[in-house]
């Protein structure tokens, strides 16, 4: 109905949305770090192994070179943008078998930190030393690897417009001018997101 100037999304626009004239303006990128309890000796998973853990096809760390311990699968609640992006990036939407679903990132971090054998996922910006980040296909989750595209678990933060930014009102153009300014980019980095390569 074109009553909104800017529509925010924590995922890429679909082809259907683009066909309706929406322009995908990526303003930031969020890396999704897979984390495990610090006692776990496994440091790297393939994308396929990660998908199999979350769908219940791999249930013990010994099958991945770790100790003989059940994998405790922790995730976010249904409707979470992080969960939606994580499952979509792995191609496992609506197939996950969670031992526990938690309503906030901090709770996932705390649960994985205190639960032996656990695995979870959080936004890169909250990653701390209470847990161990897992490499994905040999790539460490970091701002650098998200920015250069080598780390696969990442999602764009999009501000969609009806048509190109240059076709928008002066007020809308001013919003994007600020976002793309040095001050705007500093804010994006300060909140823990990665600025896209321009």
State each model region's role.
Residues 1-198:
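Exported/periplasmic ABC-transporter solute-binding proteins
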